[in-house]
Amino acid sequence: GYSGFDAMLLAHEIHKATNRFARVMTHHLWFVNPATAIPARKLGFEEATTENGLTLLKKNNLIILFPEGEHGNFKPSAKAYRLQEFKRGFVRMALTTQAPIIPTVIIGAEETHINLRQLKFAKYLIGGVLPLPLNVLPLPAKWKIRFFEPIYLPYKPSAANDSELVHEIAQDIQERIQNAITQELSKRDAIFF
């Protein structure tokens, strides 16, 4: 969701399970001025670039990223749980560093903060798409976070340069996650407490 609650709760769950802090790859607008950049770094946020991700992974850090990018995070709530096309950077990072990809599904974040639409014109003003939220305070949605088995890509680091392969891997992972989301939604009995 647009608020970042999903990333923070996911980081918390990872810390509980592993006793390690995961770095959260976030929208570049967090880092445009010190008023937001300083708290963002203290929260464990890093600007979502392939270079930053590679640096963190090479230092054996855990990272959290949402492959849809801003178009997924800021999509209107009318498109809830319909994944937008995955960007390819996460696959390239995994191949280059030989790090596993751990698919994760979060149910509940889409209802916690309602987004009316994307403000696409903001891209021309500030360099990024922004949401138009209905609520600032979170709604009491029930959440479920489900981790799946790690995916170890059976290719050499040089495969990161094969655009066709990278695209196929990203599509395959997106389909798996979309199917898992659909399955989890079918089990849900109520949205709110």
What positions do the PLM features span?
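Non-catalytic C-terminal accessory region of glycerolipid acyltransferases
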Residues: 55-193
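Catalytic core of membrane glycerolipid acyltransferases/transacylases, capturing the structured
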Residues: 1-53, 70-83
